[in-house]
Amino acid sequence: QGIDIKTDTMVLDISDSRLIQAVNPTDGYLSIQAGAIVLAMGCRERTRGAIGIPGTRPAGVYTAGCAQRFVNIEGCMPGRRVVILGSGDIGLIMARRLTLEGAKVLACVELQPYSGGLQRNITQCLEDFGIPLYLSHTVTDIRGDKRVEQVVVSAVDDSRRPVPGSEMVFDCDTLLLSVGLIPENELSRQAGVELDPRTNGPRVYENMETSLSGVFACGNVVHVHDLVDFVTMESTRAGEAAAAYLQGDARGGPALEVPIRAGEGVTYTVPQVI
């Protein structure tokens, strides 16, 4: 209760003193001096440009999240014959959704020798609908003038280089990209928040506080989560810690820091410090 919610508002800058600069159509340019800040900007999808797929630049190449919005919110189909590059959960879910809506999903193609999605989504979204999953494969060419007409898929070797002679040509009108998510941390970087090079998100303490005192982070801005349940738990922890900070219950200084080191077989840890 009593919380001001500013929609259609873009934050332009956050200073290390927690001064927020923002703009919206109603207030114009505004400054907000915050006592505590919770960063919850989420993440964005990798695009074709980020992964450098060769070929022409026709219509019909979408990120999986964009296609999801087309179907679920706009009520229109992105295409009828679809190839999906990447086996992230959004891509797997869209393979099923597009099939249910009448499209033909020809293949799901994954660069790695394993899928990037949950096993339950592989079973329920691909196997149950007879959609083939090509592991250790990638898209090596996109063909078409005004619209995608063909996609060339090739096997890759252990160095992820295309294997000559392994090409498969799919006649399709749509290519969906489900090739990973990137935590949205431009504002964090501007504010001087220390980022973890492995997660591309803020380095956080066990209470989700970042390297800047009074600035907390949670959800996919910290690292990409598989399940929204984990985001909810993390957000609750960050909110409670921000409230405690405003009441004077701040964490100790650097002398109390205990860094966590990822051991053998562990890629990274969150939090990074306790």
Give a label for each model feature.
Residues 1-274:
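Residues forming the flavin
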